[in-house]
């Protein structure tokens, strides 16, 4: 079992001992050592002779000046060694590094032709990182963003990011904004075909402000832009990117009537952001509108769903952008009175603009997931249960929802004993019989799984548990396999983020506690071989 306070094994001192570099007091003599740092890109590992480097676990060591260190690159299953860079060069797996100064070496691995499998887990960030978000495009290129402490002595966080390119691996992490306040409530959206993306976040200034930053595969990251200057605190936001690279961002913010209202802004690819627009007219004191979710439509439109609550009642509302203007807000799921309460919701659209809304709902002493479909710009009138309800006392699951471009949907949820369920629905059809992805046990999931779905309805689900482990379950040929641990670290793993493209390639990031250092963002990449 993992423990927060558990210590990692102390790295071998063989690199020093073999060269007589250890000082008599057990330390190192000042000026006699240099640092060897190794990075691994893709699926593989690197070891050294003398011992000390074993990367991806131990990727740096102090080495006596003047020593020649031999490095050996070994690909993981389904990968081949590609090349060295930095203080090593060439395409053969062995390399000798002359340590007459501190050196950096990178070993790159690429998927073997037609091979499938996961890359080794890799530490992507420095310490003090958390809240990762990931997306992957049709070509297998991925983005990861996360928050990271500015230093070990501050609580202020900044937004960082890295890009994955097949055959090249992850880029060096870079800070994505230069504002003074801490970052929270990140969302990351991408158009799979073009790879264009936008990240949005909340940042503490005089109050909480909303920010956004676009990404283009050819040009890289654009400028960070403040979305609003209304003075009221911003809460949560959501972003969707269409096939032209244009984006719709929606967020909740305290408006002129001192209540949370729903605002939107549009981004034109290569251009500017529009001024915020209030897209609902509730504005009743004591009633709050929040948790907006947005999905892009073909042709430049977008659909938004949010939750309206007064503390004892809740309903779901919607509005749509038609490519030139917003419509009128309308109730899509009504509150049925004191015996019902509506929880969190999820929204997805396919390539033709047909979509699905899924939400958790408590009715008397039962909880269940419900859904409505969106087709030809209209929401279906009657809500339908995903599966039979579960007896529960005041507990509802947050739903996870994925949809592929053809309209097949996958949803996942949990019940209080720790069981995780999933169900799929073909385009326009009802959900099938729920499947148990994970059974009840003493170690409980700490969150609802993150899920991905490809064009063949193969799927992945990843979650963290109270024992500190990260688990993966996969669906193939209509059946879920048994969950397996998906990281080999000693300490606690949490906050998984997963995305999967139509070909079944996937990217996974999570927050990993590292004893003696703090929390880092770790990543793995999956190649489907297609």
Residue ranges of predicted features:
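C-terminal motif of bacterial Sec signal peptides marking the signal peptidase cleavage site
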Residues: 15-18
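Bacterial N-terminal signal peptides that target proteins for export
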Residues: 1-8
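Bacterial signal peptide processing site
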Residues: 20-23
